Every structure is written in structure tokens, then in C-alpha cells.
């Protein structure tokens, strides 16, 4: 068999397993690495169940999350796969964006069918904008009755459709992660069938460099004789010397200017791109006019807003969060990209209060406008201490 080698030009896709506790997310993740290791050993190391299950903890926006990262390759693509073992870890990951997903494999045990967390995970996936979900109907070896499996499949499809995913069309693949992990060839083939479905159906993500330019401003200083420089890490897109840009946020109106120089590590460049830490020299703008918390963008692509709806996770006391609940008109700081802005919280109708450890929807009114799009993530802070994390789901004004 010809050796497949790691090609830089293979598309890179972020994927994850979601679903109810004990339905087999982690076993499936391990089984995928085993089956691919057996098929293309030079491309894929095998990652045993224990390694994924004992995922290291990591911090995202001040929140500790246990999450496992494994990598593997099919013939078509290179995948980074995340598996959050605990339900709370999954919720926190989705809201903080510790690991972004271009697509998700919803794991449902054929023996149980959809359970409460199955629904909650799908709802969250929609709210945080996971573009595509397909289904692994796991433990299929344990159900002999074809009618029962068909019924479970129908329930899962209805659940996906209810959350505006194309439930009628998504692939539902019957697998036994445990049997595949134990080396059963027939069930191993079903894992390959699942991966083929992932290859074929999860869309190629838009590359960060293809998106419109945006750089959050971290610092501003003036260089005598040259003008004002703003520094930061380019979040998306590319910037070329002599391109027009706007500075958006904090102020009522955007400031228009031209980038006359791009500098990285004290060297002048023609272009800066997503991921680069750069200094941008800007024409005709005084240092006092610009501040941290504004963003530099391609003109007309991003607007400043003060009112939005969000899905948030509030840290539990054990995680270093609040010890007490909060109520309507709670006024914390909202930390967007590089700066804190105070905002007033309105809770959904019927929600009296929010307890530490809860996730909830809320409306927020900021005292200063911030450049935002739906999907923007933020931390909720009190006196510099993180007490929650959230994601903008809808912008009002």
C-alpha cells in the first residue's frame, strides 16, 4: 500500500464529539484513532481511551476546562478532534470557545436514544454556531431489534431538525466504538464509514486569512516624526500597506485612516496576516484619539454596538466564581478582546436569579459601544476577577 504522508496542503478541520454522558464519546474518539492508526500507521498515532479520559485541564478566559485534543488524518483531511468528557466541561468549552468546532459528531447510544444532555448539547451547538452535525449511533451491537434502532434514529433526526440543523439529510452511522476499539474488523469498517461521512459532509472552514481584516488594539504610542502606531495580534484577514481602515468601538463614530506601514519584530513588511503580532503605522490620527478596546477593521465590515443577547456560563464557587446568585440589573464588567466595559444585565422572563455554576441567556446593555459580530466571545468580570464567560448570540443596537 502506498504511504500517505502528512501533506501541508490537506485542509485542516476542527471536529469534536458531543452527546450525553456515558453514550460513548470518549470511546468513539479512541476508536477513531485506533482504526485510522491501523489503516495509515505512519500518519496516525493511536491514542488510548485512558489518555483521552484523563484530559489535562486548561484555562480559557479564566475558566478551567478539562478537554482532550487528539489529531488524526484521513486521506482527504487533517483533523484536530476535541472531546470534553464531563457535561460541565462541554458547556464551558462551547461558550468560551476554548476549542472551536467546524463540525461535530453527535454520539447517541442506540440502547438509550436521545437524553436530556443530548438535547442541551445540540441546542448549545446551534447557539454557538457549530456549522454542521452528523450522528454516530453508538452501541448498535447491543440492539438486535431493527425497529428500535430505526425509532432512535428518527428521534435523533427530529431533535436536530427542531434546532434548525438539516435533520432529514444528515448522515446517521451505526457504530460500536467499543467493538472497533477491541479490534473487530466489521465494526472498524463502520468507523471508516463515519469518517468518510465527516470528510464528505463537514464543509471546509473558511480560512482566517480569507475573512475581512480585524485587529484588536492592545497598545497605542506615537513615534516622533512618523506618527501613531497601534499594536495587536491580527485576528483575521490580511492588511497591506496603503490600505484604508476604520477604527471601531468605544467612540460613537468610526475613525477612518490609512495604514502607512506594517511592522513585525522591528522589520517593515508589505503585509500582515491573521495570527501576526504587528504594529500598524496610521496616518493623520493623534495618539489621544485611539485607545485599547477599539479594533482596526476593513472599512464597513464591523459596527459598534451597545445592546445584545448572549449565552453565558457563570463560574461555580469551586471554580473561583461568585459565592452568591445575581439578579436582574446586575452590573459587572464585560471583557471583550482587550478591554472591560460595564454593562447592565436583564435576565430572561421567568428567571428570578442565576446561581454560580449555571448557564443562561441574558440581555446586556453596555455603557460604551464595542465592535461586535454575532459569535463574539467575552468574559464577565468583577474587579478583574473572571466570574463567567459568554458569547454574543444576537445584536439589538
From Swiss-Prot:
Ranges annotated as spanning the membrane: none
Chain positions covered by the region annotation G2: 62-66
Pfam families per the UniProt record, alphabetical: GTP_EFTU, GTP_EFTU_D2, GTP_EFTU_D3
Matches recorded under InterPro entries: EF-Tu_GTP-bd (IPR041709), EF-Tu_GTPase (IPR050055), EFTu-like_2 (IPR004161), EFTU_2 (IPR033720), G_TR_CS (IPR031157), P-loop_NTPase (IPR027417), Small_GTP-bd (IPR005225), T_Tr_GTP-bd_dom (IPR000795)
EC class of the enzyme, as a word: hydrolase
UniProt keywords, alphabetically: Cytoplasm, Elongation factor, GTP-binding, Hydrolase, Magnesium, Metal-binding, Nucleotide-binding, Protein biosynthesis
Enzyme Commission number, as recorded: 3.6.5.3
Catalytic activity: GTP + H2O = GDP + phosphate + H(+)
Gene Ontology CC annotations of this record: cytosol
Location in the cell: Cytoplasm
Region described as G3: 83-86
Location of the region described as G5 in the Swiss-Prot/TrEMBL record: 176-178
Location of the region described as G4 in the Swiss-Prot/TrEMBL record: 138-141
Ligand binding (Mg(2+)): 26
SUPFAM superfamilies to which the protein is assigned, alphabetical: EF-Tu/eEF-1alpha/eIF2-gamma C-terminal domain, P-loop containing nucleoside triphosphate hydrolases, Translation proteins
Matching PROSITE patterns: G_TR_1, G_TR_2
Residue ranges annotated for the tr-type G domain, each copy included: 10-206
Region (G1): 19-26
GO molecular function: GTP binding; GTPase activity; translation elongation factor activity
Positions of GTP binding: 19-26, 83-87, 138-141
Subunit description: Monomer.
Family affiliation: Belongs to the TRAFAC class translation factor GTPase superfamily. Classic translation factor GTPase family. EF-Tu/EF-1A subfamily.
HAMAP family the UniProt entry points to: EF_Tu_B
Protein name, as recorded: Elongation factor Tu
Organism, as annotated: Saccharopolyspora erythraea (strain ATCC 11635 / DSM 40517 / JCM 4748 / NBRC 13426 / NCIMB 8594 / NRRL 2338)
Chain's gene name: tuf
Amino acid at each position: 500500500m502506498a504511504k500517505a504522508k502528512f501533506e501541508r496542503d490537506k485542509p485542516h478541520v476542527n471536529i469534536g464529539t458531543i452527546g450525553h454522558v456515558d453514550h460513548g464519546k470518549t470511546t468513539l474518539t479512541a476508536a477513531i484513532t485506533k482504526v485510522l492508526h491501523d489503516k495509515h500507521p505512519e500518519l496516525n498515532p493511536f491514542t488510548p481511551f485512558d489518555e483521552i479520559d484523563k484530559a489535562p485541564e486548561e484555562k480559557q478566559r479564566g475558566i478551567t476546562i478539562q478537554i482532550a485534543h487528539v489529531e488524526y488524518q484521513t486521506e482527504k483531511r487533517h483533523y484536530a478532534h476535541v472531546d470534553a468528557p464531563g457535561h460541565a466541561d462541554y458547556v464551558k468549552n462551547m461558550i468560551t470557545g476554548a476549542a472551536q468546532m467546524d463540525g461535530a459528531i453527535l454520539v447517541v447510544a442506540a440502547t438509550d436514544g436521545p437524553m436530556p444532555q443530548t438535547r442541551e448539547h445540540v441546542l448549545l451547538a446551534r447557539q454557538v454556531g457549530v456549522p454542521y452535525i452528523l450522528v454516530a449511533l453508538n452501541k448498535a451491537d447491543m440492539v438486535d431489534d431493527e425497529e428500535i434502532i430505526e425509532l432512535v434514529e428518527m428521534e435523533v433526526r427530529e431533535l436536530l431538525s427542531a434546532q434548525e440543523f438539516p435533520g432529514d439529510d444528515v448522515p446517521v452511522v451505526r457504530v460500536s466504538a467499543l467493538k472497533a476499539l477491541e479490534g473487530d474488523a466489521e465494526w472498524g469498517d463502520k468507523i471508516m464509514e463515519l469518517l468518510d461521512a465527516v470528510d464528505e459532509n463537514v464543509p471546509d472552514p473558511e480560512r482566517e486569512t480569507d475573512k475581512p481584516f480585524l485587529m484588536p488594539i492592545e497598545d497605542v504610542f506615537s513615534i516622533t516624526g512618523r506618527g501613531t502606531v497601534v499594536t495587536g495580534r491580527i485576528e483575521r484577514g490580511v492588511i497591506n500597506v496603503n490600505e484604508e481602515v476604520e477604527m471601531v468601538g468605544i467612540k460613537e463614530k468610526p475613525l477612518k485612516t490609512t495604514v502607512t506601514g506594517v511592522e513585525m519584530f522591528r522589520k517593515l513588511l508589505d503585509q500582515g496576516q491573521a495570527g501576526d503580532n504587528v504594529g500598524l503605522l496610521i496616518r493623520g490620527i493623534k495618539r489621544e484619539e485611539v485607545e485599547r478596546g477599539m479594533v482596526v477593521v476593513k472599512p464597513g465590515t464591523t459596527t459598534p454596538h451597545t445592546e445584545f443577547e448572549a449565552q453565558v456560563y457563570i463560574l461555580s464557587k469551586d471554580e473561583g466564581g461568585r459565592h452568591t446568585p445575581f439578579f436582574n440589573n446586575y452590573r459587572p464588567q464585560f471583557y471583550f478582546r482587550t478591554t472591560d466595559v460595564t454593562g447592565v444585565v436583564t435576565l430572561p422572563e421567568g428567571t428570578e436569579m442565576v446561581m454560580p455554576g449555571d448557564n443562561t441567556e441574558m440581555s446586556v446593555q453596555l455603557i460604551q459601544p464595542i465592535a461586535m459580530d454575532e459569535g463574539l466571545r467575552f468574559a464577565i468580570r468583577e474587579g478583574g476577577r473572571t466570574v463567567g464567560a459568554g458569547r454574543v448570540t444576537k445584536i439589538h443596537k
